[in-house]
Amino acid sequence: MKHAFLAFIAFAFCHILYAQPKVPNQPATDPANAEAPFMKFPTIPPFHLLGLDSSTYLTPADLKKGRKTIVMFFSPDCEHCKHQTEAILADFNDFKDMNIVMATYQPFSDMKEFNEHYKMTEHSNVKIGRDEKFVLPPFYKIHSLPYLALYDKKGNLITTFEGTQKTEVILNAFNGNGTASH
């Protein structure tokens, strides 16, 4: 009887585990995103991120004009976010002329430690900030991290990605190849 009960518990656990929905990559063209605010306002959102110095705020006005932009929502303890950051750093030459905005809602100390480890802000085109008011996740309807939103030189949405992406996929989307929506 004891073994039957344990087998039932194991079966129930596995059934519950595999019954969880998998969140696929949902680019901007996905119908599931039709009602998301970023689809109604497909330009760089009016973010207000607490900077690494803990006293200034990063807004879209701080971005260099006429550049492609990546808005990446991440968590400092997310392994996929770390892999995405490492991939961008490995091919950084391809990203050096873009604005890269990295936003998190996690504690300020974790964000600062993440930057100290990856040294992202040693690159003048990379800005990291804390989304204290939790504006970006509902704006983009974020389900999984990292979340990337790509914008053209005029600040218009190209596409979005959830989960780690190869740098070629990101660059192809910017160049109009692959999964870009515009």
Predicted regions and their residues:
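Bacterial Sec-dependent N-terminal signal peptides
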Residues: M1-N25, N177-H182
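N-terminal "domain-start" segment that seeds a small globular fold
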Residues: K22-A61
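Short loop/turn microsegments at loop-to-beta-strand junctions
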Residues: I44-P45, K68-T69, L145-P146
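Short active-site neighborhood of thiol/selenol oxidoreductases, capturing the structured segment around
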Residues: T59-K82, I88
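Structural microenvironment flanking redox-active thiols in thiol-disulfide oxidoreductases
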Residues: K82-M120, V135-P138
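Short, internal strand/loop/helix patches
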Residues: Y118-A149
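Thiol-/selenol-based redox modules, centered on thioredoxin-like
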Residues: S144, L150-H182
